[in-house]
Amino acid sequence: MDSYYKNKKKINFSKMHGLKNDFMVINCIKKNVFLTSHIIKKLSNRYTGIGFDQLLLVEKSNSLLTDFHYRIFNANGNEVEQCGNGARCFGLFLLLKGLTNKKKILISTKKKPLTIEFLTENMIKVNMNEPDFKFYNLSSLQNVLDNNFSIKLMNENLICNLVSIGNPHCIIKVQSIKNAPVNIIGNNIEKNPIFPEGVNVSFMEILNKKHIKLRVYERNVGETKACGSAACAAVAVGIAQKLLSDTVHVELLGGKLIIIWKGFGTPLYMVGPAKHVYDGYIYI
């Protein structure tokens, strides 16, 4: 057995989750860790691997302006720009491992930097920056109403809203999320050629101006228990269309988040929990 591990590399990790959106988190600050998409796929398998929605890498910052660098990989091995639930777990990991003692930190990502603020040990506030409603070239979409777009799907025109929270989101308003065909529609929209890099698809049920329910199909993953950036995107759409107030409780399958946005020209904030599950190590 010892000979089996002799030429393999040992990697320590933590298993964490934010509203049951679960992650494998690796500290890469002192030791560079390179995992191929093939290895990430194997590790993400819930039957033969660790099992997770996303892999998070904690890296040292390459700038004096930020404290750490945050990298995210989906279960299929593709690197993505953003993960809101992951950001809270990333912050908690830094606290638990003694990597920071600050109450507020700034982290760089593949796109815009994020500010993470520790309200309590397990309740974390993230500045997700201002939502971007103009990130797509919408020439291929029919402009129906202000910020409403029509996508042809299975011979029908589906009305949706597009917004970026550092990653792309398609928001569909429904009367009830209970029977929404999340995986069927989500998979079809994700593969639509107008989204060459894919898109996260969310189904939003507005209960009142301060409370929504949400189900999410994450690109390259499928339906998940929760998605922080999707919650931000859905609330941003609702506020932009004057359907929601500036503070909204978002009820996802895995739990609840609070999203705060004062409107255009201001950053959007996400408040929610993060949980450490266990520590472990693997040989690859």
Swiss-Prot record:
Keywords: Amino-acid biosynthesis, Cytoplasm, Isomerase, Lysine biosynthesis. Gene3D superfamilies: Diaminopimelate Epimerase, Chain A, domain 1. The record marks H169, E218 as: Could be important to modulate the pK values of the two catalytic cysteine residues. It comes from the Bacteria. Substrate binds at N21, Q54, N74, G84, N85, N167, N200, E218, R219, G228, S229. It catalyses: (2S,6S)-2,6-diaminopimelate = meso-2,6-diaminopimelate. The active site is at C83, C227. The record marks Y278 as: Important for dimerization. Belongs to the diaminopimelate epimerase family. HAMAP family: DAP_epimerase. This is Diaminopimelate epimerase.
